[in-house]
Amino acid sequence: MSSSNNSVVYWGTGRRKTSVARVRLVPGTGTITINGRPGDHYLNFNPAYLAAVKAPLQTLGLNEQYDVLVNVHGGGLTGQADAIKQGAARALCELSADNRKPLKTEGHLSRDPRAKERRKYGLKKARKAPQFSKR
């Protein structure tokens, strides 16, 4: 293992709903690898998911300069794509402190607090009540 290769890896962790993504940025050609598979295959070629994953790099104009290597688990594809987006943004902040301001104004660094609401007893779902019968 060469020490020069290890010194230019930038890490970031992102979360969304129940998804957790560990993102590594390595100088390269701009390929995205998620759980060992190409990013477009993993995200089912969905343009919205691919745009979300690439958004932090495009904000800074670095989309062809870094490879994105991701380990992600939990949740569905929407949560995973947004978790990857946040992890990539945090890794870019580690790359340079000047990157923080444009990423923050675009909203890539904020953790989306929305999660599934718990089911309450006496109700069918989180808020749906059983049918009311007057008589």
Swiss-Prot record:
The lineage of its organism: Bacteria, Bacillati, Cyanobacteriota, Cyanophyceae, Synechococcales. Pfam families: Ribosomal_S9 (PF00380). PANTHER family: RIBOSOMAL PROTEIN S9, SMALL RIBOSOMAL SUBUNIT PROTEIN US9M. Residues 116-135 have a biased composition (Basic residues). One of its GO terms (molecular function) is RNA binding. Residues 96-135 are annotated as: Disordered. Belongs to the universal ribosomal protein uS9 family. Keywords: Ribonucleoprotein, Ribosomal protein. One of its GO terms (cellular component) is cytosolic small ribosomal subunit. It comes from Prochlorococcus marinus (strain MIT 9303). This is Small ribosomal subunit protein uS9. It comes from the Bacteria. GO terms for biological process: translation. Residues 97-115 have a biased composition (Basic and acidic residues). Coiled coil: none annotated.
